[in-house]
Amino acid sequence: MAKPVREVARLVLLDANNAALLMRYDDGLADRISYWVTPGGALERGESHRAAALRELMEETGLAAEIGAELWERHFDLELPQGAVHQHERFFLARVDTVAPRVFNSSPEPIREHRWWSLSALKATRDVIYPEDFTSALATVLNGAPHGAA
């Protein structure tokens, strides 16, 4: 039987210095490590990816930003507490015109920390970041080419 598809919108949110906002998730389970991801989440019934991106940005950061170009997408299988799904994520660019604005999380998710990451800090970290190619994808975006472009 095919796994249900979980549609997700994610944001590559950049500040005025091109630092990217990532959130550290840690559910406190001993057998799982914490990891960093971009803001975003599952679409609600009838919601577009762009609308979900705006809603998730506000819920997870308290920030508002105009949603820009779609950068890339990815598909993968994921085990959630409710069961296995096939996740389809679409990533959108968004910018804020200040440097490292303060963020506020109002979502019930196990978000433990927000951090604005420079490209050099991302290249140097040993922390787990998803998607795994986020650092190289961000470098491509900052150099002006869409991720995956030849």
Listing of model-derived features with the role each one plays in the protein:
Residues R24, L71-F76:
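Generic short beta-strand segments
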Residues L22-R24, N105:
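Beta-strand scaffold of nucleotide-dependent catalytic cores
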Residues R126-A150:
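Charged phosphate-binding loop/patch that engages nucleotide di/tri-phosphates or the phosphate backbone
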Residues W36-T38:
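A short gly/proline-enriched turn/hairpin at secondary-structure junctions
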Residues E7, A16, E70, H88, ...:
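Residues that flank catalytic or metal-binding motifs in active/ligand-binding sites
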Residues L29-S34:
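A conserved beta-turn-beta hairpin within the catalytic core of GNAT-like acetyltransferases
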Residues M1-L21, G41-A42:
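Conserved N-terminal beta-strand and adjoining loop/helix that marks the start
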Residues L43-E66, R74-I129:
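Unchanged
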